[in-house]
Amino acid sequence: MLDAIKAAGLDSIAVGKIHDIFAGYGDTEYVYHKSNANGMEHATNYAAKDFHGLCFVNLVDFDMQYGHRRDIDGYANALTEFDAWLGDFVKGLGEDDIVLITADHGCDPAYTATTDHTREYVPLLVLGKNVKPGSMGTRKTFADIAATVTELLGVEYENPGQSFAKEIL
C-alpha cells in the first residue's frame, strides 16, 4: 500500500517506527518520536500541513511501555491522554480528512499468564467530518484497511482486502 501511494505521487508520511517496520519502503517522509505524546504532536503538526496522501502513525507506548509490561494504570492513563488529544485533533481536521485508528494486535495489560501479545479483536475507529456513523462489524482482514485507504486516495492497488469506503462515506 505504501509503495503504491508513493508511486502515485502522493505523500506517504511515516511517524514513529513505521519507517523501520517497512524498512523505509513506501514513505516519502518520516520522523521518529520519543513517546505517544510526541507522536501525537507530530500527527497534529502534519494534519495542519497541506498534504495529500497518508500520514501513518504508530503510538508504540501502548504496546511496549504498558501492554507487554502489564501496567494497567499506565495503559489507562495513556488511553485517557490519547482520548483527550483525539477530541481536539478531530476538531482540527479538514473537510475531507479521514482518521483510521486501529492496532495490529491485542496486548491486554491485565493478562498476566504471559507478556506476549493477546488475542482480542482490535478496534477500528473511523473519524472525519463526512464519515457516516455506524458499525462495520468484524472485518476479515487488515487488508481491508489498505483497500479502503487506497480507494479513498484514488490509488490503484491490488490486494485481497475489501474496501469499506462506501460504508463510511
Enumerate the language-model features and the residues they cover.
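Feature captures the catalytic ectodomains and active-site-proximal regions of enzymes
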Residues: M1-L169
